[in-house]
A protein has these predicted regions:
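Conserved acidic, metal-coordinating active-site core of Asp-based
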Residues: 110-171
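An N-terminally biased module of ancient metal coordination in phosphate/nucleic-acid-related enzymes
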Residues: 1-56, 140-142, 146, 161-164, ...
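Short, glycine/charge-rich beta-strand/loop segments that flank catalytic centers
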Residues: 46-49, 104-110
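Short, glycine- and charge-enriched coil/turn segments that flank and shape catalytic ligand pockets
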Residues: 39, 100, 108-113, 185
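Active-site gating loops and adjacent loop-to-helix segments of metal-dependent hydrolytic enzymes
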Residues: 52-84, 101-103, 122, 126-145
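Conserved phosphoryl-transfer catalytic core
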Residues: 81-108
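Alpha-helix N-cap and loop-to-helix initiation/capping positions
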Residues: 78-82, 151, 202
Length: 209
């Protein structure tokens, strides 16, 4: 995880003139990055909202959002509160399995970002409870694990609306990974304006797809 200054430095090293920070369900890092850029790099305010269609998790990117939008901040606060509550529920279930983890250890790892199961897994790794993050998911907190707790998510259409209402442009994140081709026409009707094509795991063939 980079600090805002380190992130801007990496962008400069790559000889890029523009960047966007799109943390999951969180905009706390946007202003510090803009300040760190100091006008040397254009920073597009962004966010990545977690949403669902039935049981399928869908990630919606929002670019050019107004980070001062009260409606957006209210929605993100609601999501953050649910994520925090979820962590406590997970820790209670882990305790029932004689796995003891302090909530503050998890929140310290999450920092100012939105807390998630990944941070629980990293805290378990730090305490030597598991040998790697994957083990934490497979043995304890994954969807089939004994300490699994479902997440609160927006509907995909509502995620698009939240982005648009905040003055942003809604873009479907890594669509090939999400295998949701048949849902895209409905997303477009709801206001979707783009698809993420350049993603670290995508080959040229996938990008063309």
């Amino acid at each position: 995880t980079f600090t805002p200054r380190e992130l801007v430095d990496e962008v400069k090293k790559a000889q890029l003139s523009c960047m966007s920070l799109t943390d999951h369900d969180c905009i706390a890092g946007v202003k510090p990055v803009i300040e760190a850029a100091g006008g040397d790099v254009e920073v597009i305010p962004g966010v990545e909202l977690t949403s669902e269609v039935d049981t399928l998790e869908i990630h919606m990117l929002g670019y050019f959002i107004d980070i001062h939008s009260e409606a957006l901040k209210k929605e993100l606060t609601r999501i953050c509160e649910r994520r925090t509550s979820r962590v406590h529920e997970i820790l209670d279930k882990l305790k029932q399995k004689n796995v003891r983890l302090d909530a503050q250890e998890v929140f310290a790892i999450a920092g100012h970002g939105s807390v998630s199961r990944l941070h629980v897994a990293r805290a378990m790794l730090a305490k030597g409870i598991v040998s790697n993050v994957s083990e934490a998911f497979s043995r304890y907190i994954g969807n089939e694990g004994p300490a699994y707790v479902g997440k609160f998510s927006l509907s995909a259409e509502n995620a698009i609306k939240v982005i648009i209402d905040a003055g942003g442009i809604a873009v479907l994140a890594h669509p090939y990974s999400q295998q949701c081709d048949e849902l895209i026409p409905g997303f477009i009707k709801a206001g979707l304006r783009g698809l993420e094509v350049y993603y670290p795991e995508y080959s040229p063939a996938v990008r063309r797809y």
